[in-house]
Amino acid sequence: MINKTLHTKHTLLGLLAMAVLMIPVWSQAKVQMLDRIVAVVNDGAIMASELDERINTIALQFQEKGQQLPSPAILREQVLDRMILERLQLQLAERAGIKVDEASLNEALAGIARQNDMSLEDFAATLREDGYSWTQFREQIRQDMVISRLQQRSVASRIQITDREVDRFLSSELGKQMFQEDFRLGHILIRVPSEARPQQISQARAKAKEIIERLEAGSDFQQLAIALSDGPNALEGGDLGWRPAAQWPTLFAENAINLKKGEFSQPLRSGAGFHILKMIDRKGGAEKVVTQYHVRHVLIKADALTSAEQAQQRAIRLHDEVAAGKRQFKETAAEFSDDPGSARNGGELGWVNKGEMVPEFEQVMLNTPVGELSPVFESQFGWHFLRVDDIRDADMSTEFRRMQATQALQKRRFEEELETWVQEKRSESYVDIRL
């Protein structure tokens, strides 16, 4: 099954919305100076020109938002740190053979365009008019998707939530609040190495306490996050966005629940370091009526005897035969689908809630009209095509609450383990910064 109860989704569109790492075309027209290496990452390198291009783009974004930039040295350090983590994960993905095909990339780009109320062609034209390279934007989105798939394979696929855990969670105060409130949190992280010496821990603790003192004296949380945080959202002022209360990591949820709007926490210790949270805002939570989709699909997977390209061609052939009326969808799924859970039922997945499936599947499901066949598309599980048989609005039932609770626990566990995993991979890698 590709159901999210087995595979936690790391919100892809959240990553895509952050794909602001486009390279302005005009920056390429500058006189080319002698390039140099600013960081060695295992067997790869980050060049000064790459870093400068990224900094130029982020500086433009700050300017457009009317935000104050940190000092050039701090901005350079923050951007380079982000690029190092990206490069490490892309190297891991390449070794694991993780790729994103053109069809999946185009579907993701179309989703971004729809979010901006544009067609894909209009969206591309708008970017070009604003001086950005469409080719480089596409490549950045592809890299974001590759990293997301790597994280799914390396972290999310190991997470299993038991019925007993769900029962305990639903009966807890936090579980009850999950259906009542959403939190928007700000975050500052003072990183501590995984095998830190006592002196390093003391220095990090002292730095976190100094930040608290500055906040208490009236300093701006967003500016401190940009200048001092080691977190992945530092350049967004530490803003982690909105989530249901229970979808935050346990450490965050339990300490944020009593914060009023505008308040911040004391330093919180985790394996990654010291965290400071700010309650940017809080509001009422999930709606009681949800849209559900009755879906069937066919999955064709690559294996030891079938290459990814052969699996794709097989999926396309079966899709075209169903579309031409040469085959029935149900019989095709029963005979050929590599998803045994649904194949025996003619590919039927039953009623599916928005947010329940992996991103690539959900995106296609939401954009396929009732009764029509979707294009062939790729997810981390293989090649699919699907049909939406019906759509309905349903009251939030006990079953749906359990599904929401399972997703919340998965997302929480994923965030906790992802942070540790990224830090471990960086510790295991050779990184030489040459700023």
Curated annotation (Swiss-Prot):
Domain of life of the source: Bacteria
Predominant location category: periplasm
Protein keywords: Chaperone, Isomerase, Periplasm, Repeat, Rotamase, Signal
Subcellular location: Periplasm
Pfam assignment, any one: Rotamase
Swiss-Prot/TrEMBL catalytic activity: [protein]-peptidylproline (omega=180) = [protein]-peptidylproline (omega=0)
Signal peptide: 1-29
Domain PpiC, chain residue ranges per copy: 180-281, 290-390
Signal listed as a keyword: yes
InterPro entries attached to this UniProt entry: OMP_Chaperone_SurA, PPIase_dom_sf, PPIase_PpiC, PPIase_SurA, SurA_N, Trigger_fact/SurA_dom_sf
Methyltransferase as UniProt keyword: no
GO molecular function: peptide binding; peptidyl-prolyl cis-trans isomerase activity; unfolded protein binding
Enzyme Commission designation: 5.2.1.8
GO biological process: Gram-negative-bacterium-type cell outer membrane assembly; protein folding; protein stabilization
Comment on protein domains: The PPIase activity resides only in the second parvulin domain. The N-terminal region and the C-terminal tail are necessary and sufficient for the chaperone activity of SurA. The PPIase activity is dispensable for SurA to function as a chaperone. The N-terminal region and the C-terminal tail are also required for porin recognition.
Protein task: Chaperone involved in the correct folding and assembly of outer membrane proteins. Recognizes specific patterns of aromatic residues and the orientation of their side chains, which are found more frequently in integral outer membrane proteins. May act in both early periplasmic and late outer membrane-associated steps of protein maturation.
Protein name: Chaperone SurA
Gene name for this UniProt entry: surA
